[in-house]
């Protein structure tokens, strides 16, 4: 209803101003600005729904102030360009319409009415309401009743008798199991769901809507609200350190806790969270690659579900035979947005919907088959009678190719329990949320029936039942939950440990690199993660007077304040204010101690603008003083005009990447010498080793041969045509995820470059 009212007010404002208001520059500018704001808000809402499937939420707020990177980002580039072009066209059309009667005299009454209607359209829009609520959630002090509802359970389970298998299905929401909406999509796992305790109304709340957040909510009974973006949790050294979570209780009760997944454990800080709360045995892509049958059988995120669940079954057998009480948690990945992945062993590789194949539905059908196979192995084993199996989604599906069909249904998370000790078949339609999952499991295992804000759905009352406005209530508790992190409020001294790549201050520890905004009463950590912008881009968003401490590789800050460190990959510390003074210190000891030294100086806006502009220079446009191209730092020597076909810097150098160009091409600002030696320090990847690699300058071509280890080769060139471009053509680029950023599409690697130097020859 509010959408229609908002649009009606918008349309009325446009018509009244266009036909009645007449000519006046101020009223035209004011009305166009407000109407333009209406357009921007609604396009933001549309775009947010496209990315998150949940309107304008915390994730959108973070994305708007940082960058969108991660899995499948290329899928969103065209829609993003379309939105920008559409926005430009709408603004142009809006301005043209409003100025149609610019030759008529100005009418104050109609101008005022049009402006008021425009303001009303903004106020009535759902986008404005969502943003207002989001901003309020960032600035509240908390809710006084939080302590009354947040309850810590007993730290142990008296006389535990059951082992636990807990399966997180990536984005595998209960909506997929509606056989009327999606016929025969989930027959195997759906049949198992119908044999157990099926909780049919598990809603998703703020702070529980992505993987690590869903895990925290289900194991600790709280949403993942933090003084930083949740997926950047890999930078912290402990995770809600004061909270009692399900893993803590299991460990205290004699359980050995195991976690198995196909992706890298470091992503989003899953390793930190699990280690902080009772899990001593963790297996991710790095740990599994030496034990799986085929270490090359991987998707963009890691190992496929069939591989992961096979390893989980082996671990279940091993632990069951040992007689040791255990919990085994596993997380699938094949149903990750935007398209999902199809394991090669499943029978259900294709699912048609609306008369055509749908990749996301196909991935769901395949993954549920793999999960069902794993569960049926457990059920057929002699140890099932001592086991509780839990299957849940980590969160609702995000914007995938099935999303528009899911949105037509009543969407809920998946949560069902199969008890080997006491089979029960029942569908429970009680209102609940993800935070109730851990408390329900704890209750089944013989522990308390509450865990944080979670309550057992078998013997307690969920917050979703107590509060009709549970989403708003959850956001009201956000400051209280953030305080559970026990983050420091001041930073005066700090220590950097180079061996551990950590910084410590006021009792807190963080992984490097790290950016901190420091005020009188708050220290705000801004870690770098797969989903965040580089720290220098985050720093560029600081106000002129914001105090900062930035710990990063020296070359990243050298172009601003320490050009002598432009080629250093050591750690450096910079601090100060973007509009004031800044200092850079080289971390030259294994354990390095520093102090904050912020000065209350006069703010220079010209300096501030210059710093911000420099911070925002993209990597490939950075230039440094050097007589060679050093590939383990960002940018290129000053003599280089542009380059292509080269991947990002890594600690040793850079790979060529055929996804960015079939050739490595380095164009210099001036012609290369008439006679020169090209000194190349490099290595080859895969089948490119021991193969002739063409290297061209103008019409002359030489051959480079590399092995899998780094070597230095000198090639002799004559350049009579004054060519200014060096071209290297890897013969057989290999598609691989080796060394790739988690969730990104595979790179096509050819040669790995450490240094390229042009040395002029006499004569």
Curated annotation (Swiss-Prot):
Query: Which EC number applies?
Result: 2.7.8.20
**What is the species listed in this Swiss-Prot or TrEMBL entry?**
Escherichia coli O17:K52:H18 (strain UMN026 / ExPEC)
Q: Does the keyword Oxidoreductase apply?
A: no
What is this protein's function? Transfers a phosphoglycerol residue from phosphatidylglycerol to the membrane-bound nascent glucan backbones.
Membrane spanning stretches = 1-21, 26-46, 77-97, 108-128
Q: Which keywords has UniProt assigned to this entry? A: Cell inner membrane, Cell membrane, Membrane, Transferase, Transmembrane, Transmembrane helix
Q: Which CDD domains match?
A: LTA_synthase
Pathways involved: Glycan metabolism; osmoregulated periplasmic glucan (OPG) biosynthesis
> What name does UniProt use for this protein?
Phosphoglycerol transferase I
Membrane topology is: Multi-pass membrane protein
Q: Which family does it belong to?
A: Belongs to the OpgB family.
Top-level EC class = transferase
Q: Which reaction does it catalyse?
A: a phosphatidylglycerol + a membrane-derived-oligosaccharide D-glucose = a 1,2-diacyl-sn-glycerol + a membrane-derived-oligosaccharide 6-(glycerophospho)-D-glucose
What Gene Ontology terms describe where this protein resides (cellular component)? plasma membrane
